[in-house]
A protein has these predicted regions:
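Metal-assisted phosphate- and nucleotidyl-transfer catalytic regions
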Residues: 142-150, 154-161, 188
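Short acidic/histidine-centered micro-motifs embedded in hydrophobic/aromatic stretches
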Residues: 126-129, 171-175, 190
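Short, charged hinge/linker segments at domain and secondary-structure junctions
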Residues: 120-125, 162-172
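Active-site substrate-recognition loop segments, prototypically the cytochrome P450 B′-helix/B-C loop
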Residues: 1-97, 106-124, 128-146, 155
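Central I-helix of cytochrome P450 enzymes
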Residues: 102, 106, 149, 176-204
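Hydrophobic/basic alpha-helical segments enriched in Actinobacteria
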Residues: 161, 165, 177-180
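Acidic interhelical loop/turn segments
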Residues: 93-94, 168, 177
């Protein structure tokens, strides 16, 4: 069936390209706002916003993902790859997922966001909790880790306001939508989404 109800995620699943495209282009009938009503109180911008706000929010980070910008990071990413490969013991079995494919995307998105790669284990744990892929299945079990993630990003906001850099978090903190600055919890949700999008999608 091209469209069916999935009990495990409590949602309709659409599998045909033309149907998906039609739904994505019709925000009036198929609003993303319902996504923000399903889980926790932390809204994840872009996932829960429709145009024109969705378009304005995307514009904030689009420049960080242009081919020119990404090309400028190529050597740095290659260095990250080389460093991680050099750490592997050629005489021992390797868990390629744990030792390479998980930490590499986290290293790249950490660089873009200006957050310490040393917290990579926390970033992975938080991402798993927010996406529901952690060992704790219920939202109630995952909520402490989600709130820990939110607290981390909220703690960065004052410093980025006072000393902005070229990182994504600084750009989000300084951004305006419809002439107003984003509220702190909007900034927190935006950063949580970026961290997930920057590592969870790639590692999987």
């Amino acid at each position: 069936q091209p469209i069916w109800w999935a009990d495990d995620i409590n949602a309709w699943v659409v599998s045909r390209y033309d149907d998906v495209r039609a739904i994505m282009k019709d925000a009036k009938k198929f609003s993303s706002k319902a996504m923000g009503e399903r889980d926790h109180e932390i809204s994840l911008p872009l996932l829960t916003d429709d145009p024109p706000k969705h378009t304005q929010l995307r514009a904030i980070v689009n420049k960080a993902f242009t081919s020119k910008t990404l090309k400028s990071m190529e050597l740095e990413v290659k260095d990250m790859v080389s460093t991680m490969l050099d750490r592997l013991d050629p005489n021992q079995p390797v868990d390629i997922s744990a030792d390479f494919t998980i930490p590499l995307p986290i290293a790249v998105i950490s660089k873009l966001m200006g957050i310490p790669f040393a917290k990579k284990d926390d970033f992975k744990r938080w991402s798993d909790a927010l996406t529901g892929t952690s060992s704790a299945n219920s939202l109630e079990e995952r909520m402490p880790q989600i709130m820990e993630m939110a607290t981390f990003f909220q703690s960065l906001i004052p410093e980025r306001r006072q000393n902005p850099g070229e990182d994504l978090i600084s750009k989000i903190v300084a951004a305006e939508v419809d002439g107003r600055a984003l509220e702190d919890m909007e900034i927190v949700g935006f950063n949580m989404l970026l961290l997930i999008a920057g590592n969870e999608t790639t590692t999987n």
